[in-house]
Every structure is written in structure tokens, then in C-alpha cells.
């Protein structure tokens, strides 16, 4: 079942109430389309599942156990580098659309505080996770180059633009 914008608004509100100010403890990529984060609040530990599977894209808290690969995939390693230890300072969504932004306050390799945003785009077969800093893409779970799309590319270093779903129906 696909997640519509109204349902996502409710889910995002619940996640914000539960996870705001939580600290990222661990990050895993159990499958090529899913990321699992362990976040700690002052009182609890939560497991956040971010799925970019085309048939079941979703964002939710889970108690389910996942088997992780022995060697973490590249995107997982990148998320660990840029997000582990960061605090969730804001959770927002694109109004009327199926995109949720997780803003994390993190320390970079120079020791400076930076805000890294994980954009979770839940758009059916175009679902994706995109890590952004300062409006520029650090990387995406599913890279999109010009051969894949003339409209929007998702490659490291490019400016991030959100994918807005528009209907041409009159």
C-alpha cells in the first residue's frame, strides 16, 4: 500500500514528537533500498526505518530485527560518517507532498557544527534518500544522472531541488 501525503503528514508529526532532539547512535543498511537508524532520546532508544523500496516506500519506527550485511554498503558508510552522533533538530515535510526532511546538527571532520539534512522522498519507483548539506547533495541512495532523467539529477555536488509531484489533469 502506498503512503499518501495526508498519512505521511500524520506519521511525520508523530515522529517529530517522538524523535526531536534524539541522537543518532547507529546506522545500518539491511537491504539496498532501506536504512535503519538507532536514535536515543533522554529516556528511550528508537529504531527508525527509512525505506525507498518502490512498492513499499515508508518511514516508520520499528521493533523488527534486520540482518545486516557483513560489510556495510557505501551509502551506509557515508551516512555513518556524516550523521552518527548528530542530533535531530528538525523534522519537516514538503506540504502536500511525500517528502520528509530530517535535519541533524552534526560535527564535521574539522570539529565545526553543521546541519545535514536527510531528504526522504517517498515517490513510488522514484523513492530515494538524499543527504544534503548547505543545499548541495552529499550523495543519494539511488544516484540519478542525465541518462536517467533530463529533469532532475541526484549526484554529489549538485544543488538539491525537491521533487515536486504535479498533476497535469485539468
Outline where the language-model segments fall.
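Acidic, proline/glycine-enriched N-terminal capping motif
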Residues: 1-164
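Conserved small/polar residues in nucleotide/adenosyl-binding loops
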Residues: 165-170
